[in-house]
Amino acid sequence: MDFMRTVLEDFQEETGNIYNLEATPAESAAYRFAKIDTEQYPDIITANPEAFREGAAPYYTNSTHLPVNYSDDIFEVLTLQDELQTKYTGGTVLHLFTGEKNMSGLAAKNLIRKITNNFRLPYITISPTFSICPSHGYVVGEYFACPKCDADCEVYSRIVGYMRPVNQWNNGKQQEFKDRKLFNINKQSKKVVVEEKESTFS
C-alpha cells in the first residue's frame, strides 16, 4: 500500500492530475475471478477452500479486508483494519455486519461514537440483516421462512452500497454471506483497549 501511494504521488507530480488510491468493491469480480482461476488451477487457494472442495462456489476476499469469517470481535477487526483503511485516498469503507437482532438507535449511536473516538477509519457502515415476509412485511434478522406464518421470506443484506435480496446475489456472494461471521457489538476484545472518551457531540 505504501509503495502504491508513492507511485501514485509520482504520477501526480509527473502529469499534474489528481489520482485516488481506492479500495475497489470487486463484488462481482471476487467470484468471477475465483471461478475462472479454479477452473484453470483447481488447487489455487480461494477464501473458502474447504467449502469449495465440497462443492460450494469459490470467491476471493475483497480488496484488503479480512476474510469474512475471521472474527466476530468488532474491535479486533477495527484495530487490524485501521492502519490499512487509512492508507487509501478514496473509495474505502468497512462494513460492520451486526449480529444483533435489533440494534436500537441509542446502541448504534454509542457504537459509532466509540469507533470515531478510538479509530481513524474514514468510512464505516452498520449493516444489519433483515427479512421481508409477503404477509407480515419487515422482520428483524435473517429468516428465510417467516417466524409467524412460515411463508418464504426475502432476506436482505448489504452488497456494495445497497441493501439487496441475498437470493439475487451471484453464487460467490451468496457463499460469502453463508460464511460471514456477524459482529457481536457487546464483545470487547481482550487484545484491544477501547477508551470511553468525551465526545464533542451528543
Predicted features along the sequence, with ranges:
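Long, C-terminal-biased catalytic regions of enzyme "large/alpha" subunits
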Residues: 1-202
